[in-house]
Amino acid sequence: MSLSALESTINSAFDARDGVSTTTKGEIRDAVESALELLDKGEARVAERGTDGTWSVNQWLKKAVLLSFRLNDMSVIPGGPGQASWWDKVPSKFEGWGENRFREAGFRAVPGAIVRRSAFIAKNVVLMPSFVNLGAYVDEATMVDTWSTVGSCAQIGKRVHISGGVGIGGVLEPLQAGPVIIEDDCFIGARSEVAEGVVVRKGAVLAMGVFLGASTKVIDRETGETFVGEVPEYAVVVPGALPGKPMKNGQIGPSTACAVIVKRVDERTRSKTSINELLRD
């Protein structure tokens, strides 16, 4: 089935999703399974970057993921610690894999790394004990460090370092919401959170503990420019706070969190300078 035929079938099935269930067979099930296989192999992805730098979302692939929850019944997933099992609708990406399959895939998956089927992991990725949700895309030579989460449909670029305990938000619903996107060569500091469709542009550095959502203000302290929903290329960002506004009693109100661009670097400087040096003020 061609991509256009897959898209048409999935869009029609999603419009009539109340009639889709675990007993549904035939064209709809085949189309959803084909779409998930394309995602799993990296032959299709939920979001794609255009030549002008804008990202477009393939909503039909998100619909395929959502339809899979209606099509698939709960089942026992063995292999837990202490001979325990899990109970879910989504199998592991690694189900049935042996040495040859892992060698062909070309990435490392440390014990404790969990990847759900339909997530794509590119060559030379290192997965420490972490969680990668369905529909996500993790590109070449990226590190996903311990206890980090890559949410559903999130798009992670090449040579990205996702430090320990980072949360990269996922999105399936609402359909119009875009996924979190971390472009190539970014560094996401430990315990940071990037959610609600924020785009972190190429080469940006987030210090430890930066929290970014769709409404978080990212302020360039040199120019005063404010960004919302996006971190510019090669920006070095630290946690910050905006001063509180006066309350009715005349006292200064509580401050609100923001993120602060403390400097910007070019590609050459970014490639030759350690992260610690960049974050020194």
Swiss-Prot record:
Residues that coordinate or bind substrate: 108, 145
InterPro entries, per database record: DapD_Trfase_Hexpep_rpt_fam (IPR005664), Hexapep (IPR001451), THP_succinylTrfase_dom1 (IPR023180), THP_succinylTrfase_N_sf (IPR037133), Trimer_LpxA-like_sf (IPR011004)
Stated name of the protein: 2,3,4,5-tetrahydropyridine-2,6-dicarboxylate N-succinyltransferase
UniProt keyword terms in alphabetical order: Acyltransferase, Amino-acid biosynthesis, Cytoplasm, Diaminopimelate biosynthesis, Lysine biosynthesis, Repeat, Transferase
Family: Belongs to the transferase hexapeptide repeat family.
GO BP of this protein: diaminopimelate biosynthetic process; lysine biosynthetic process via diaminopimelate
Location(s) in or outside the cell: Cytoplasm
Keyword Acyltransferase assigned: yes
